[in-house]
Each structure stands twice: as C-alpha cells, then as structure tokens.
C-alpha cells in the first residue's frame, strides 16, 4: 500500500501518539494476522470493528481478538457466517468476548429489500472420470466448457475456486486453458499465497491486483476469469462478478462466503432501486437478476458437492437460516 504501514508495535504506538498529540483521529487497518502487533502497541482504542469476524474464532487469532475486545471501549463484530462452540470459549456464543447479537438479518429479507440477489445452483454434467493424475486437465477443460455455455450477450465475470494451489498451477501452466480463454476474449487473473498475484501474464502486487479486479468488475464490457484457492473467498466486494465455478468441496462457511461473491447487486440496479425506477426484490427486472454457482459433476466426483451446495442455498436463501458452523 502507498499509505504509511508497519507491523512493528513501537511504530504503531508512535503513529498513534503523534495523531493524538495533534488532536487528530487515528484509524488503523489491520489483518487478523497482524492484530497482535496492534495489541502489543498498548494504545487506547475507542472503537474496534471486526469484519469477517468468524475468523476471530480460530486458535491463531482468538487471543489477540479477545484482548482487543477487552480493552477497547466498544467492539463490533460483523459476519455472514457465525461460528459457535460447545467445547471451548472460542465460539461467537462467548458473550464475554463477542457480546450479544444486536442485529441478525435473514438472507430472504436482504433479497426482498434489494441488498442482494438470489443464487442459482447449476450442475454441469460431464462424461469424465476425475483422478489425481488427470485432475488439472479435467478441471481446465471443464472451465473452458462452462465458459462456452455462458450468455454471449452479457460480459461474464467468473470466479473459479480451484481444488489446490498445486492443481491450479498445473491448470495454468500445463494445459492450454489460458490460451483457450484468451481466444474467447477473456482476461485471466489468479492469486494464491504460493504463487502470488497475476493479471494476465504480468505478476503484480496485491494492491494492483485488487484495484484491477475492482475496476474490471465495474466495467460492463470486461470479460474475465479470476482463479483462486482460498484467498478471495472472504471480504472481497466485486459487484460485477456474475458466475462462480466450484471445482472443490467446501465447508459450510467457505461455501456461503464463496456464494456471497456473486450475489452482490449490480451498481446500476442499486442506483435504479434508490431512485425508484426498480422495485426492490423484483429481481427478474434487474440487469443482474441472480448469481450463478456452477458445479461440475463428473462420473466419479461432484455429486456430493452439488447436493451439499443446494442444501446450503436452500437453508440460507429460502428458509432464512444463518449458516452456523461449529469451531
């Protein structure tokens, strides 16, 4: 980032003290990984906001989150996928750390008031047998085939959840998938903790990657496919994403978070709802009426994934049940 940044506690404390001495507000953004550095800085915190707060329930992050919640004057936790525990104190049902639930909005209400759009699960049947040795080639062919069946009249912006960094690396480097996508006028982006971030053939830093993703997501004429293993599934707000392809089975939280990437309402639809041109909840009249989640079903793989996915979608978006998970 081009803003001042540091993960050294003494520099964080110095930055905060300078701002306070100048009677200026001090806003600190941190990842959960670096939160302990802020805690170690020993600064006074008026308000702490924890986004994607289900991450706070992991062994790695719970202690600094609990410490921050304890000494901050006020703390607020936001998540679409709460985690609870019956065996230890790391669950979000620990009111000492996470407080009481002050707002819980069911997904059907969000659809009806024009905040999100509904997801549609699409099973893509193939005649292939997916094995460890053939996984990369089968998955590469599957992505190309799904892309071929998308609507030519609307520029598609596709998120692909890869089975692993290893398989993704082989899909990108040992098949002709990238060329196949280029021949179809699609840009290709991919990001993993192992290989870093790429825009087409160019390696970029994370800031440029996400800025490009946001800009292209807002451009109606841009067609792109973005591949990831796990780094994108949470907290990435790209309203333009229209399709998601699940190449691997996910747990409930990961499924719900991945679905959430493609059900953001189109910005022009949001503007028309605000002006009264569109009625909230009448999604059939939106430019982007739903978010598609495609799951390949091979001869020996995929049937269980699509069944679990449909159950998760029905529970969240039809019955209004939050996707609770145990930690």
Regions found by a protein language model. Name each.
Residues 23-65, 228-230:
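Conserved RecA-like ASCE ATPase "motif II neighborhood" in helicase/translocase motors
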Residues 55-116:
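Post-DEXD/H (motif II) to motif III coupling segment of the RecA-like Helicase ATP-binding lobe
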Residues 100-169, 173:
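Conserved interdomain linker/interface between the two RecA-like ATPase lobes of SF2 helicase motors
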Residues 141-149, 155-159, 164-167, 300-327:
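Long, largely alpha-helical accessory region at the distal end of helicase-like NTP-driven motors
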Residues 165-192:
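Conserved helicase motor "Helicase C" RecA-like lobe of SF1/SF2 P-loop NTPases
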């Amino acid at each position: 980032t081009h803003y001042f940044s540091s993960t050294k506690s003494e520099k964080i404390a110095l930055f905060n003290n300078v701002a306070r001495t100048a009677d200026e507000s001090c806003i600190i953004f941190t990842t959960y990984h670096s939160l302990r550095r802020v805690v170690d800085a020993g600064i006074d915190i008026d308000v702490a906001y924890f986004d994607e707060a289900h991450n706070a329930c992991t062994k790695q992050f719970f202690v600094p989150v609990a410490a921050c919640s304890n000494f901050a004057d006020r703390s607020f936790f936001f998540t679409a996928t709460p985690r609870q525990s019956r065996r230890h104190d790391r669950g979000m049902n620990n009111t000492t750390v996470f407080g009481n639930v002050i707002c819980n909005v069911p997904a059907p209400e969000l659809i009806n008031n024009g905040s999100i759009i509904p997801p549609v699960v699409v099973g893509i049947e193939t005649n292939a047998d997916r094995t460890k040795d053939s996984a990369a080639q089968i998955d590469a062919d599957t992505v190309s085939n799904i892309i071929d069946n998308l609507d030519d009249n609307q520029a598609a912006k596709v998120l692909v959840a890869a089975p692993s960094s290893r398989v993704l690396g082989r899909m990108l480097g040992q098949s002709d998938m990238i060329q196949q996508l280029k021949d179809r006028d699609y840009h290709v982006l991919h990001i993993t903790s192992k290989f870093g971030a790429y825009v087409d053939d160019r390696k970029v830093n994370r800031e440029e990657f996400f800025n490009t993703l946001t800009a292209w997501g807002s451009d109606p004429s841009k067609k792109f496919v973005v591949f990831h293993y796990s780094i994108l599934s949470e907290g990435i707000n790209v309203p333009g994403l229209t399709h998601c392809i699940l190449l691997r089975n996910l747990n409930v939280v990961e499924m719900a978070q991945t679905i959430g990437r493609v059900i953001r309402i189109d910005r022009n639809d949001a503007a028309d709802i605000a002006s009264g041109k569109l009625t909230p909840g009448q999604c059939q009249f939106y430019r982007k009426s739903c978010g598609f989640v495609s799951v390949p079903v091979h001869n020996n793989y995929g049937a269980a994934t699509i069944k679990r996915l449909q159950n998760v979608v029905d529970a969240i978006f039809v019955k209004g049940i939050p996707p609770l998970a145990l930690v």
